[in-house]
């Protein structure tokens, strides 16, 4: 999540909060110089003595890699806008349930409870407007059909970093929103006035971020029809 509120803490999305070091290390592989955004190495697991934990324990990446990793992220800014709403689900499932579909009975059994749980956590939506956000399905859809369908928009080469050690900001996606001019020197390291090495053109991550899809209003219905072959 880059703009709106997150689902686990005010700043930490579930996956980046659960293992911020893993996320930060993967994102670092998108950088032309991964060492510029590598997080500090965490201590050995609790109770482990020096030399007991499996070596190498989160060893440093090489200074240079054969190529940069291509990562396209789908933050909650985009995934939370793709929903299956309770009313749409019920209307779509009525004839399928009437046909005796075991799959429809199974999914309805747990999705009805899920809709109820989501409704209990919300203060502004209820009834048929309660929606389930399609985080993982949207990513799968992108991988399956991106090459053959217009409407996707991905911002490329964004320097998005993951906070790994903040007391209140663990798992936060950090971006530089300042209007500072990039440094023109060839120095990759930090310099006075550039704490964090945000201004070097040779430092930082290069992450793709999805900001638009061809199915913001239709994906939920499309997913149901594909799953139940309607």
Spans of model-derived segments:
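N-terminal acidic, glycine/proline-rich low-complexity segments
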Residues: 1-230
């Amino acid at each position: 999540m880059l703009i709106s509120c997150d689902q686990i803490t005010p700043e930490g999305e579930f996956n980046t909060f659960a293992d911020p070091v893993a996320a930060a290390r993967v994102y670092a592989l998108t950088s032309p110089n991964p060492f510029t955004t590598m997080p500090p190495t965490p201590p050995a697991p609790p109770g482990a003595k020096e030399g007991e934990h499996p070596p190498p324990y989160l060893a440093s990446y090489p200074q240079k890699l054969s190529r940069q990793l291509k990562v396209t992220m789908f933050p909650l800014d985009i995934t939370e806008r793709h929903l299956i709403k309770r009313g749409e689900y019920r209307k779509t499932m009525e004839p399928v349930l009437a046909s005796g579909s075991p799959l429809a009975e199974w999914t309805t059994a747990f999705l009805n409870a899920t809709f109820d749980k989501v409704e209990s956590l919300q203060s502004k939506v209820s009834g048929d407007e309660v929606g389930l956000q399609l985080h993982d399905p949207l990513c799968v859809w992108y991988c399956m059909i991106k090459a053959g369908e217009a409407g996707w928009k991905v911002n490329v080469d964004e320097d998005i970093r993951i906070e790994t050690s903040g007391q209140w900001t663990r798992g936060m996606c950090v971006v530089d929103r300042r209007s500072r001019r990039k440094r023109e020197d060839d120095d990759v390291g930090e310099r006075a006035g550039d704490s964090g090495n945000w201004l070097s053109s040779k430092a930082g991550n290069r992450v793709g971020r999805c900001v638009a899809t061809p199915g913001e209003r239709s994906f939920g219905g499309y997913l149901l029809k594909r799953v139940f072959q309607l």
